[in-house]
Amino acid sequence: VYGDPNLRTHRAPLPTPPIPVTSGLGNLVEDIASSDGRWWDSARTKAFLDSLSPTQRERMTQLRRGSGVKYRTAYRRTRHGVAVWEVRPDDVSGCLRTARGGSSKQAVVKVGNQRVQIRWMTPREYARLMGAGDYNLGGARPNQALFGFGDAVAVPAVEWLAANYLIPLIKGTIPQMAETLPLAASGV
């Protein structure tokens, strides 16, 4: 791309991006009472657990036996024509997706002390995971909010890019890494 004389391009030196977040989901999950109707009933929870592969089932067994409560996210996938659930092994969320076009919403799995509870992730949790936890969700239906934050660009990523690239570029203070190549005559 940079060597194509038909494209006007430039490069700029950027600092090393922050280290990826590898934990903290439990800090962002809403504290929802065990009696809240958003938690799935026993039949739906059983269907979830029954759909797990042996690897997933073992993961859930280990988490269930552990002391204290842990949170994980889960996705519904189709494997060999059958809908199954996959639970993340770590304390982070998977990619937030919109619930359209074949993608699915994430479920929150609360597990530990021999208990398992499952529910859909809330719009507030989607917002928190995207760095917009204080965003006013008033007036938006839950599915609108999920759609708005699913497949979006996370606020911290945009802030870093703005501070380290866009604002210096606008101010003309970004150092050039390579010469800007002139546009070739387009014949227009």
PLM regions: where:
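Flexible, glycine-/basic-rich loop-and-beta segments that form/coincide
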Residues: 1-51
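C-terminal target-recognition/interaction regions appended to catalytic cores
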Residues: 30-188
